[in-house]
Amino acid sequence: MGQIKVEKNVGGIEGLCVIEPAVHGDARGYFMETYNEKDMKEAGIDIHFVQDNQSMSTKGVLRGLHFQKQYPQCKLVRAVRGTVFDVAVDLRANSETYGKWNGVTLSAENKKQFLIPEGFAHGFLVLSDEAEFCYKVNDFWHSNDEGGMAWNDPEIGIEWPELKGEYKGSASAEGYTLEDGTALNLSDKDQKWLGLKDTFKF
């Protein structure tokens, strides 16, 4: 294999991969290949990505958990500035790990990437003052196909780092803060998603 190190089936969940590109540094700075199709195929990952996206979010923002139902997306995600805790939840009905989650800290410093196959819900929490988040997807956004699930469903039990608060029966951000007092910040839509038992299955 060339310029990447791949950890497969992280958290015991089939298909989830953590990818670490080789970083070549010297006194001037560094260089790395953030994506190389040949290296990915040599690692057994053969995915055709069609779009790159980038977002900026401030500390305490939680985006998710999202998916597309009829046009599911595989995502390759990374943080190019700041730090996020990135989460994938298995929604594949026939999977032995249905309803299980795994989380990875992604940062500009560790340069890790998280590969999330089709059939998962995905989201992230921003832990730094700001974070820029980049992701490749293998299908386009379809506005009428959006799905989601509650980020704090106790049946799933995601352990969001630095987050304090008490579950009150919904995905509302009310009462949740980070350890430094920063209020949790979710979109109105993301505060209305339901739990696993009422969520779409692939």
Spell out what each predicted region is.
Residues F114, H122-L127, Y135:
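Short beta-strand His + acidic residue motifs that chelate non-heme Fe in jelly-roll/DSBH
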